[in-house]
Amino acid sequence: QMENRSDKLSDVHWRNGWKNLWRTLGHPIETIEQQGWGDFVTTELLPFSTGQNDAQYWPNYTNHLIGGGMSYRMMREWYRAHGFRHERSWALATITAYHLLNETVEMNDKTNLRADPVADMYIFNVAGVLMFESDRVSRFFGRTLNMSDWSFQPLYDPRRGTLENQGQNYMIRLRLGRTTPWSLFYHWGNSGEFGASRHLGDG
């Protein structure tokens, strides 16, 4: 649920968003050159910028690299558990369709080329899939960091034509010791919260 976006599906300019996204992804070098290579590297790739509007690398690393990679791995394991052959292909197709739909919505009100989808689709989403293909990486995030998908349960309101309660969120929890019930806690997605959590004996 994003405050800066309408939750009415009819307010999304789907054709314009897809057209802009197709132009951007079809001409990645031209898109980056229009923004400037230096600006692209410092805002999208490397953690050099600190301004809120310039630190696009933060959601790139957290949502696309780690979150997207974990979502791919979960999807792959879901397809495998349900007896699908070629579970990697199914998972990749599903997660790619999701990412393209998300980028289309983000580009629906834009008129110029934007380098953010280039970094998302061609760098961080791909790197996330490759990273979580590793069983060792997946075990680290799943067992050591106890990473979970804490996304909302979306619903469609046909009377108002709105998509309610949507949002993709993730959580990691790092245990502070084998004998302590306390863990460092970080939750991110629609917003970010850092703190501590306590394991209760009854679950």
Language-model features, listed with the residues they occupy:
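Hydrophobic alpha-helical membrane segments
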Residues: 1-203
